[in-house]
Amino acid sequence: MLLKLENSSKKIHNALQEDLQMVEATSCGGVVIYRGKILTLYKSYKNRYEGWVLPKGTVEEGEEYHETALREVKEEAGVQASIIKYVGKSQYSFNIQNDVVEKDVHWFLMSANSYHSRPQREEYCVDSGYYKFHEAYHLLKFSNERQILEMAYNEYLDLRKSNLWGNRKYF
């Protein structure tokens, strides 16, 4: 499933008119669940944005998407997680200096091994915690992350209903 922010095409159009360079980027992240609650992080980027987000980050050279997602969850939140399944891809764009970055984010449903989390200030994370679905949904800053959360949580509920949550891992 592909989710796209509504204003992405406007930004691309504006970039073409303003002679900005288009840059493509790929990130991966996780919807991490422990005992029905979802891990969220409070990020504070200087002069960019501040708010609650799902853990995600840039794919490093030679990395598979699932490896990036697991590494980013560990780096940003200090959480050891296991991938249950691939959820989908979201897209958004943003401006940096003379570039318009068009970003794809691949998302995975994950299971954590404990409630313990440790936000990493080096990753601009100043707080973290596990929240009930409706709390996490309303905390999240970005609509595309809310949509991914909804998809992932529905997958989680389906797996629980079938008594499969925690029994099968794809990676």
Question: Each PLM stretch: what is its role?
Answer:
Residues L2-G29:
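Acidic, metal-coordinating catalytic segment for phosphate/diphosphate chemistry
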Residues L5-N14, H138-F171:
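Charged phosphate-binding loop/patch that engages nucleotide di/tri-phosphates or the phosphate backbone
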Residues V59-Q147:
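Unchanged
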Residues K43:
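Short loop/turn segments immediately following the C-termini of beta-strands
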Residues L54-K56:
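Thr-Gly-centered strand-to-loop micro-motif
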Residues K37-I38:
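Entry beta-strands of beta-propeller and related beta-repeat scaffolds
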Residues K46-E50:
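A conserved beta-turn-beta hairpin within the catalytic core of GNAT-like acetyltransferases
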